């Protein structure tokens, strides 16, 4: 009997600037045939409209035509699938993660589905990745980040590096999207790892 399950990732989008990161992570998860359980906060929906021009939540547009892999769950529905600890998945990522969401999770507040799913992910000792995007950080943000790190969350600021010599905004977005997928244990072909980048340079030299 084959008990293997498809890889599942829970993904939350909140109202911090950084919609291109969320879009790219979803595209890459879909390319890897990962099932995506998506919840978008009210301000996250506004973010998608403001930064991507997406007036309606369109799973096909978020995954380059692989909307069949996406299950959208209403952020007001605290009884949705991802709110239950019995729902098995390989990790949750909130990208971008606002300071408001960060503070709520750190305080144990579950006022919406994203916050509830994050709390459940922590209590079940599953992987929770918080792709925070705020600058500068207040002292309250720093304390919340420390508290969540101690609770087991992986704090992943959306701070792309420049050592791979990015030439476009897309290169910067891919840098962080690749890092997030690495943390989730999802395969990708992006040139975002330093050792593989050096090897690729050697192979491509005349």
Residue ranges of model-derived segments:
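A cross-family phosphate/adenosyl-ligand binding-site feature
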Residues: 1-129, 135-206
């Amino acid at each position: 009997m084959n008990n293997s399950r498809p890889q599942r990732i829970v993904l939350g989008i909140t109202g911090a600037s950084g919609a291109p990161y969320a879009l790219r992570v979803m595209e890459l998860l879909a390319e890897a045939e990962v099932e995506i359980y998506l919840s978008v906060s009210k301000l996250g929906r506004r973010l998608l409209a403001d930064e991507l021009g997406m007036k309606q939540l369109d799973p096909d547009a978020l995954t380059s035509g692989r909307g069949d892999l996406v299950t959208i769950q209403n952020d007001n529905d605290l009884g949705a699938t991802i709110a239950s600890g019995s729902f098995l998945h390989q990790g949750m990522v909130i990208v971008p993660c606002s300071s408001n969401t960060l503070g709520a999770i750190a305080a144990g507040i579950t006022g919406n589905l994203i916050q509830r799913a994050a709390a459940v992910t922590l209590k079940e000792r599953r992987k929770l990745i918080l792709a925070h995007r705020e600058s500068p950080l207040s002292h309250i943000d720093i304390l919340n980040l420390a508290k969540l790190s101690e609770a087991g969350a992986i704090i992943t600021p959306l701070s792309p590096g420049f050592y791979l010599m990015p030439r476009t905004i897309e290169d910067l977005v891919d840098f962080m999207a690749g890092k997030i997928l690495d943390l989730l244990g999802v395969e990708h072909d992006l040139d975002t790892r330093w050792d593989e980048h050096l090897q690729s340079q050697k192979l491509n030299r005349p």
